[in-house]
Regions:
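Short loop/turn segments at secondary-structure transitions that flank enzyme active sites
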Residues: 107, 173, 200-202
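Short conserved micro-motifs at the rims of enzyme active sites and ligand-binding pockets
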Residues: 112-113, 178, 204-206
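Conserved catalytic alpha/beta cores of large enzymes that bind or transform nucleotide phosphates
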Residues: 191-280
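Segments forming glycine/polar-rich beta-alpha architectures that bind adenosine-containing cofactors
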Residues: 175-183
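Short, acidic, Ser/Thr-enriched surface-loop or helix-capping motifs
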Residues: 183-184, 204
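N-terminal beta-alpha lobe that positions the nucleotide/phosphoryl donor
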Residues: 1-166, 175, 250-275
């Protein structure tokens, strides 16, 4: 999952990664075992006799998420998260830094199934109490209708799943997006594809806006394709915590989101990451 990959990039490469920490998969199992949730969840899941029945699926998932959110996290686990957040605050010389809390499920990267992107991410989270709550919300997001349906169809045991929550310093980006070390439009592994949009990256990941698309040749490190798409809205931080949607200024809506220099800098990081993992 992303927790281990981010840790590896932080310690073994010079690719810039926002500081942070992660709860472990063991912490998730500890939470559901110490509180008796595992047996309660097993009982609720037993009622899911027909995953194609959307009403039944939704009802079961609502109850699963509710059971998790209603259950207080064990105090020692809360204390461990609080200490890690305070250590991050000390490292960043901030009292209560704004962070992103992201889900990293142990089932994300099985060879015959793709579970990635099925759990939730929370941005601009402020204060230890909110971090603890959002970690629990990440746990609950393992049981959205979509995630449960997919695991059922894959024959994956819901109670074998575990989740690590990644807590990273929030980056208040003017532009953000995703990057691939292959051109996903045609499968060409000699090119890097970068997609970017104004604001925070969740609108790109969620398909809410159509990002700009840039293609860079790996060998020559030259920009070979630029596709600029009009963007009329973006997601930004809300003062005090959380996020909000605002209009993109009229003058910027048809402009290229990233400069050519930024695109090539990002492509350089992509090559380093690919080389580190031995993919190219």
């Amino acid at each position: 999952g992303k927790s281990s990959s981010l840790g590896e990039m932080t310690s073994k490469t010079d690719v810039p990664v926002p500081y942070g920490f992660a709860t472990t998969a063991h912490a998730y199992r500890y939470f559901i075992d110490q509180t008796g949730l595992r047996e309660k969840m097993r009982s609720i899941l037993a009622e899911l006799t027909d995953v194609e029945n959307s009403e039944l699926l939704s009802s079961v998932c609502v109850r699963l998420r509710g059971a998790i959110m209603e259950q207080e996290m064990p105090q020692d686990l809360q204390d461990a998260i609080r200490r890690a957040y305070e250590e991050l605050a000390h490292k960043m010389n901030e009292d209560e830094p704004y962070v992103a809390v992201r889900s990293s499920a142990t089932a994300e990267d099985l060879p015959d199934a793709s579970f990635a992107g099925q759990q939730d991410t929370y941005l601009n989270v402020h204060g230890a109490d909110q971090v603890i709550r959002k970690v629990k919300e990440c746990y609950a997001s393992c049981f959205t209708d979509r995630a449960v349906y997919y695991r059922e169809k894959q024959g994956y045991d819901h109670l074998s799943l575990a989740l690590s929550a990644v807590v990273q310093m929030m980056v208040f980006s003017k532009a953000a997006g995703v990057m691939f070390t292959v051109n996903v439009a045609n499968g060409d592994d000699k090119n890097i594809m970068i997609e970017g949009a104004y604001g925070l990256g969740e609108y790109v990941v969620g398909g809410i806006v159509t990002p700009d698309s840039y293609v860079v040749s790996k060998d020559e490190m030259k920009l070979i394709s630029v596709s600029v798409n009009e963007q009329d809205k973006m997601l930004i931080r809300k003062p005090g915590g959380d996020t909000m949607e605002v209009p993109v200024p009229e003058a910027d809506r048809r402009k290229q989101t990233l400069t050519n220099a930024q695109i090539l800098e990002l492509a350089g990081y992509a090559k380093k990451i690919e080389a580190h993992y031995g993919c190219y």
